[in-house]
Amino acid sequence: MFSLDSFRKDRAQHRQRQCKLPPPRLPPMCVNPTPGGTISRASRDLLKEFPQPKNLLNSVIGRALGISHAKDKLVYVHTNGPKKKKVTLHIKWPKSVEVEGYGSKKIDAERQAAAAACQLFKGWGLLGPRNELFDAAKYRVLADRFGSPADSWWRPEPTMPPTSWRQLNPESIRPGGPGGLSRSLGREEEEDEEEELEEGTIDVTDFLSMTQQDSHAPLRDSRGSSFEMTDDDSAIRALTQFPLPKNLLAKVIQIATSSSTAKNLMQFHTVGTKTKLSTLTLLWPCPMTFVAKGRRKAEAENKAAALACKKLKSLGLVDRNNEPLTHAMYNLASLRELGETQRRPCTIQVPEPILRKIETFLNHYPVESSWIAPELRLQSDDILPLGKDSGPLSDPITGKPYVPLLEAEEVRLSQSLLELWRRRGPVWQEAPQLPVDPHRDTILNAIEQHPVVVISGDTGCGKTTRIPQLLLERYVTEGRGARCNVIITQPRRISAVSVAQRVSHELGPSLRRNVGFQVRLESKPPSRGGALLFCTVGILLRKLQSNPSLEGVSHVIVDEVHERDVNTDFLLILLKGLQRLNPALRLVLMSATGDNERFSRYFGGCPVIKVPGFMYPVKEHYLEDILAKLGKHQYLHRHRHHESEDECALDLDLVTDLVLHIDARGEPGGILCFLPGWQEIKGVQQRLQEALGMHESKYLILPVHSNIPMMDQKAIFQQPPVGVRKIVLATNIAETSITINDIVHVVDSGLHKEERYDLKTKVSCLETVWVSRANVIQRRGRAGRCQSGFAYHLFPRSRLEKMVPFQVPEILRTPLENLVLQAKIHMPEKTAVEFLSKAVDSPNIKAVDEAVILLQEIGVLDQREYLTTLGQRLAHISTDPRLAKAIVLAAIFRCLHPLLVVVSCLTRDPFSSSLQNRAEVDKVKALLSHDSGSDHLAFVRAVAGWEEVLRWQDRSSRENYLEENLLYAPSLRFIHGLIKQFSENIYEAFLVGKPSDCTLASAQCNEYSEEEELVKGVLMAGLYPNLIQVRQGKVTRQGKFKPNSVTYRTKSGNILLHKSTINREATRLRSRWLTYFMAVKSNGSVFVRDSSQVHPLAVLLLTDGDVHIRDDGRRATISLSDSDLLRLEGDSRTVRLLKELRRALGRMVERSLRSELAALPPSVQEEHGQLLALLAELLRGPCGSFDVRKTADD
């Protein structure tokens, strides 16, 4: 059995036997950080002495062994400490030894450990007094002291000084002058990209802006070589100013030249007997000679070095504190040259034939000089009423036009319901008695007497399935069943469908048609009159658009209100206002746990009825118990370490081992495992399948996630065959939303995914965080529904006490653009702040304002927060406002189908991606993308291929296609449903003549669907300002200039490309401009996971906002007024024509938004067709390729 302590003890004994020399005494920082977790002063001093320690270690071992890198001899092992990152560096040459380093970032900890190792090397005599390297022959002799094998040595070629510095002209001694970039930045340049990103980088332009504001004196030039021999007093004063001059010189040269040693660039020659005369020849920054004398050799050399330091300071090459400058400052001239290159506009050359076509078009269809894209505010007198929702009221139950029942019809229907109810007796008797049943009269009377009632029921009390039936029963048995029309909301699709099916079964065959459900992409509504409709919250919000007072509905039951999801909180605002419009409506809020008194206060002190639940005993085990059961005592210390620092890392191997242990030794029955997200579900599923191997047929491994269509999740509710154990892998969807009756064992990771919005960076991050205590109670309760059970919590008992009582409401931690848009649809007369201030928990006003600004920026709201004509169209499309905008524009630009596919795939990933196969998925995406430089077009090709095999191929071919392209069939089915739904939305918004046109290749809305640059450009126009400009060169936080790296600049600052986007690994980009949908924050950095290269002319012609032109009559530049991301240059005629073409495109969009698109006059359709043909031809031209000159690991 592995033991970390015994491992270390054995290694120490081995080292004692292996080396005759006593083990070195490690400096304090190599053992422990200071008590507060900060890095000690000794550690900082080490980094001053060894400014590039990893580079130096690699150089020593590389020189000694004659190898190009020392990866196998230096192993960095990372551990997370209480407050700091910890790195243990295992050194395998010249003997096995370990040192430790600490830092707030992984790279900092590695540098600390490497610096400690450098100190050891220096103590062992492997480095010279100025940290210089020796030749291989000397290392051969030194190695014999350590017992290193001799056969691993060979003699490398002697290292020569960097050519660029040896051949410096005296004219070029100013820092950063020519030659400063001729040498590579060494191995430390090639750090793993993610570690480098953690340390923070800025692009060249930002760095130059910062240096212009720096208060340091400007660096001065020196002309010609110099020879300095001053009197001894001057040398003594210089030595007083620079007490360690050799070290300082070495560090300056190492940093400036990115070299591991300064030996070849600073050479001492000392002569004399009683009085020593030392001559220092300094080859950097240009040949200089310094002479000093002393009684001893060391004294004379130190004085000469001090004079050199004084000279370097006079040149501005040492800072005011007598410390070296950064590598970037030494290469400032190269930085400025690169910055100047970045600032130059991109040259555009449009072929003459296309320019003539543009001129002809503009002459035939001139854009009035006074035409400006107007503020498209909703005004009933001049804008076409949009959408079918503006017609008669819709019946919330059936979706058909609402017509109140005549009295005679109501009586007849009520009588029919009563007869059916009386005939269902035996079926009702079969339903088990639930804890809620004895409270039926109390509950029903409260609902009858109060407009709002809160029902708090423990898990298993039966409130979800039984209370709707109790309401229906009372109305039917009292002869007024036709008046009972209940809408019950559920937070998730799977729960709405499963609960509807359960209630339908309990009511029996005669009343089954009175129960129905409606969720996204699936609908089976009940008949009106005596109806129970189960739906998601989003569906009810849509129904409120077409029937704002919910006429025809007797009760609304909002279930699982304690989850506090953003849609439910939004619905409560509307329902609270609805009481004035429809006082007869009864509202019931049902909660399993949570602060129910808060809901009561929100609704004016409405009654709260508490229903106790019944749960069989559940035996609980915590992490310390579980590790003991599994025989993993050695891991307890590590997990306690994680516990102390609030780390939310899930060990999937431990989860798998626990499930297998339960299967081998636990009671019969189902196992329900709560995991944070889809990646963890897939990871555990794959591990279980690998572990079970040929015995997998004895197990039913069922993932439960919103990514999976309902039809693929029905098996979780079914009893498995005899001898087969059910293993359900689920997110928190299984806490309260669904009930799986045969679960006996619950494995609780204690984690879930939670979206959080960073107001500063304006990006969301989906973080894995600890659940609340209320969640733990709910999860535990899943094991005791139908029999005694067991709960296994993968966290210590002490963690339970640290958990928050309840989750933070989603409305307080997510972006609010969708919510603000919904508010404008339901209550356009109220400002967003005014509307959302009425929520149970009001969001931060700044977050609301940010959402309004974004919607104004993309043209959905005007300055007075009214919906524009674009906003009215978007209101019909159920997705993110930016994606909805892309769909609207795609209909206008006649490339609709590929955009529908892209938006659907951004909603639901079609690839079967897991923690294990991410690299393979990335390769498949790159192949599907071809040379388009687009993750989004990879989606289009993947779905197109799937549609092709569905149409023409047999089942075997379909399975092969899925396997070869790592696609997930349930997700593809869901995507197909989304495309169908969006097609209906587009039809409702009057953008197509009929829904089927959206996917028809021959339809006008798809005339240019094969034009890839146009498709990407329209996507960019929808997502704008989500635009990236790729820039060459960057500067790290430590001040290292990396000219061969790239940065990715957005309007709000630098971001990073995630490994999952194909453009991350590209060595040549067809365009320097990328668009993206979502940026996420992880470990302090902002990442983009999906991107597409876009034509610079698409950016110019299709984005919102103004452009700025500078024209001298011959050449002209044109740029976006709202950012510095695009500057194009061309001859004056070309720029003028492009500006007019841009205005013509704006006019086309505005006309299309103000009319029913399919009903535009033929002359206008013809004009638009010619314009789009011109645009497509223009975008087929070259983008101006961009070489991404990256280092090996960039």
Swiss-Prot record:
Major localization class: cytoplasm
Domain Helicase ATP-binding, residue spans? 444-612
Keywords attached to this entry: ATP-binding, Cytoplasm, Disease variant, Helicase, Hydrolase, Intellectual disability, Mitochondrion, Mitochondrion nucleoid, Nucleotide-binding, Phosphoprotein, Ribosome biogenesis, RNA-binding
* Location of the region described as Disordered in the Swiss-Prot/TrEMBL record: 1-27, 150-199
Q: Which GO terms describe its molecular function?
A: ATP binding; ATP hydrolysis activity; chromatin binding; DNA helicase activity; double-stranded RNA binding; G-quadruplex RNA binding; RNA binding; RNA helicase activity
List each copy of the Helicase C-terminal domain by range: 654-827
Q: Which PROSITE patterns match?
A: DEAH_ATP_HELICASE, HELICASE_ATP_BIND_1, HELICASE_CTER
Q: Where does ATP bind?
A: 457-464
Outcome (variant: residue 785 to C): In NEDMIAL; changed localization to stress granules; decreased RNA-dependent ATPase activity; by inducing the formation of stress granules probably indirectly decreases global protein synthesis
Q: Where in the cell is it found?
A: Cytoplasm; Mitochondrion; Mitochondrion matrix, Mitochondrion nucleoid
Q: Which PANTHER family match?
A: ATP-DEPENDENT RNA HELICASE, ATP-DEPENDENT RNA HELICASE DHX30
UniProt family annotation: Belongs to the DEAD box helicase family. DEAH subfamily.
Assembly behavior: Identified in a complex with TFAM and SSBP1. Interacts with AGO1 and AGO2. Interacts (via N-terminus) with ZC3HAV1 (via N-terminal domain) in an RNA-independent manner. Found in a complex with GRSF1, DDX28, FASTKD2 and FASTKD5.
What is the designated name of this protein?
ATP-dependent RNA helicase DHX30
Native source species: Homo sapiens (Human)
Phylogenetic placement of the source organism: Eukaryota, Metazoa, Chordata, Craniata, Vertebrata
Report the gene name: DHX30
